[in-house]
Amino acid sequence: MSRLRIAFMGTPAYGAASLQALVDAGYQVCGVFTQPDRPRGRRGKTQPPPVKLLAQQHGIPVYQPARISRDGVDDFRRLQPDLAVTAAFGQILSQELLDIPRLGTVNVHASLLPKYRGSSPVHWAIMEGETKTGVTTMMTDAGIDTGDILLQSTLNVLPGETAGELTLRLADLGAKVLLETVEALEHGHCPRRPQEEGLMSHYPMLRKEMGEINWSGSAEQIARSLRGMLPWPG
């Protein structure tokens, strides 16, 4: 088992894949930070995030601050992590928090940065008609998906693939790339390179009202919108 202490931050199933990979690889996940339980589904029943459920299965301490940079810094510091990992956490990290892990914070982002920065990269890649996408591990800084790139891996977008289906494949790919990244960082041989700002694209977070399809578009545009909005907010 590695002696590396890792604090993990993530919320949906995409993040759970990376957490499971770290546990299976024998890393010491000293704590998990995830979003608070929230109402979900048509009945609005309060449900825990997938990352929380997985952490509890493995007996890992769980923290659910509404804003980690305001309410979770002390808990985070007490864990004394060597490294932090984020995967679809859903919160912005303060510089105070980023300065705590001696090896920094690695983010597992579901696009080939610097393209598709932001919180909904999979959906937008499909809606923009991309035929290839991938995952990037990057060193988190105070910006939004602006840190140095560590490793990347690509995959093809399958014909007719929805955002939900593609997210599952990217989650598995991201978990594999994360393990390669953590191992390289642990042994001090993980090169990093700055993002090329000239190639940057940033897309907004999806909102429920975006699920309304513009039927005046071409057949291809409508099909891409439908695929990109499934399973939510379509």
Where are these regions (language model features)?
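N-terminal glycine-/serine-/threonine-rich beta1-alpha1-beta2 phosphate-ribose binding loop
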Residues: 35, 39-82
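Short beta->alpha connector loops
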Residues: 11-14, 66-69, 89-91
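N-terminal Rossmann-like dinucleotide-binding module
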Residues: 1-43
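Conserved beta-strand segments of alpha/beta enzyme cores
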Residues: 28, 59-61, 104
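Internal anion-binding site segments
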Residues: 2, 197-234
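Donor/substrate-binding cores of folate-linked one-carbon enzymes
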Residues: 25, 35, 83-202
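Amphipathic, non-transmembrane alpha-helical secondary structure
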Residues: 16, 20-24, 73-77, 179
